[in-house]
A protein has these predicted regions:
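A charged nuclease-like catalytic/ligand-binding cleft shared by nucleic-acid processing domains
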Residues: 3-8, 15, 19-120, 128, ...
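Surface-exposed flexible segments
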Residues: 11-12, 66-69, 133-140
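Internal, well-ordered interaction modules that form the hydrophobic cores of assembly/scaffold domains
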Residues: 57, 98, 107-160
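Eukaryote-biased recognition of electropositive, low-complexity segments
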Residues: 89-93, 135-185
Length: 185
């Protein structure tokens, strides 16, 4: 998860939805939202081990509109949900590489790992989505459907070219995490 993307999307969606619904929305319960994303990705109740990598710059260490919100305090923490255990790791670019390069490197490592059964991606689409989409397309183009199901790319808008993996909209799980019912939308 790119923290800058999460902050922009969650903050923007919260402000938009509060205006549309005419009421104040709670901050997002981060473990609950991650559970909704995992369900969208196909995980079901069992003993899943979900590693959540929070990729950020040193200055962006707070999750806006989320609880818990301190990225550094989340580092090396875990929580259990009916889907399994979510273990958090804070990964910072520390100025050595860009967040984009770090995200793409971590994504490539996970794609190549036999230990990773499902890779859920939330990059900063507006900043480096094209790079993510090019890498995904190159990796999955010649793979079969089962192999293509390894990655779930959470999107705010449709990619301009095929990425050859599963696409899921991020908005519905976020609306659910805000406590919004489908008939309110």
């Amino acid at each position: 998860i790119d923290v800058a993307f999460l902050n922009e999307v969650v903050y923007g969606a919260k402000n938009f939805l509060e205006g549309k619904l005419g009421r104040k929305l709670p901050d997002v319960d981060l473990p609950a939202w991650l559970s909704y994303l995992a369900l969208d990705a196909g995980l079901r109740e069992q003993e899943n081990e979900v590693e959540v990598l929070l990729v950020h710059t040193p200055a962006a260490d707070v999750l806006k509109c989320c609880e818990p919100s301190d990225v550094n305090k989340l580092n090396h923490q875990a929580c259990r949900t009916p889907l399994g255990e979510f273990a958090f790791s804070s990964v910072t670019s520390s100025g050595l590489v860009s967040t984009e390069e770090l995200f793409l490197d971590l994504m490539n490592l996970a794609l190549d790992s036999a230990d990773v059964k499902c890779l859920m991606l939330l990059p900063f689409h507006q900043v480096y989505g094209n790079g993510v989409e090019e890498k995904l397309a190159g990796f999955f183009k010649d793979k079969n459907e089962e192999e293509r199901g390894k990655a779930v790319y959470f999107i705010t808008e449709e990619p301009l070219s095929p990425v050859y993996c599963r696409l899921e909209p991020v908005f519905y799980s976020l609306a659910h995490a805000f406590g919004i019912k489908s008939d309110e939308l």
